[in-house]
């Protein structure tokens, strides 16, 4: 049934960009308890560090007391890929616009899941924050 399918698949999807001296700790837990046979859980934490002074800690945790489940976790954090930035700049984008394109490409799938009534407001706020940070 549709109601029971909600509990068959759960996703934790964290994406973002850290600037200046920002620090972030991700603690995600997927707990497969008895009775959840056939369930799938995914958790991921992906961050772009826009400054070498940022700190990103990712602590995904999978707990399981059931058979026949699938649990996946992933984590990735790093500086902007300068090859990508260079590529965009050779296509006419400024450094600032290239940075925004890369960050937006990371977080856009999450923004697109938001209710339409707030989507543009959230995207505008992200752009505003990136525009006011060190370049």
Each predicted region: which residue ranges?
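Conserved beta-strand/loop scaffold segments within soluble protein domains that form the structured core
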Residues: 1-86, 90-93, 107-109, 114-135
């Amino acid at each position: 049934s549709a109601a029971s399918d909600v509990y068959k698949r759960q996703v934790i999807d964290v994406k973002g960009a850290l600037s200046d001296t920002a620090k972030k700790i991700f603690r995600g837990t997927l707990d497969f308890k008895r009775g959840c046979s056939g369930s799938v859980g995914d958790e991921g934490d992906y961050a772009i560090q826009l400054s070498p002074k940022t700190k990103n800690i990712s602590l995904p945790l999978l707990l399981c007391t059931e058979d026949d489940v699938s649990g996946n976790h992933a984590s990735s954090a790093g500086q902007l890929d300068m090859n990508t930035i260079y590529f965009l700049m050779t296509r006419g984008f400024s450094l600032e616009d290239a940075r925004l394109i890369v960050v937006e490409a990371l977080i856009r799938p999450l923004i697109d899941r938001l209710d339409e009534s707030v989507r543009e407001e959230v995207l505008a706020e992200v752009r505003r924050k990136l525009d006011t940070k060190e370049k």
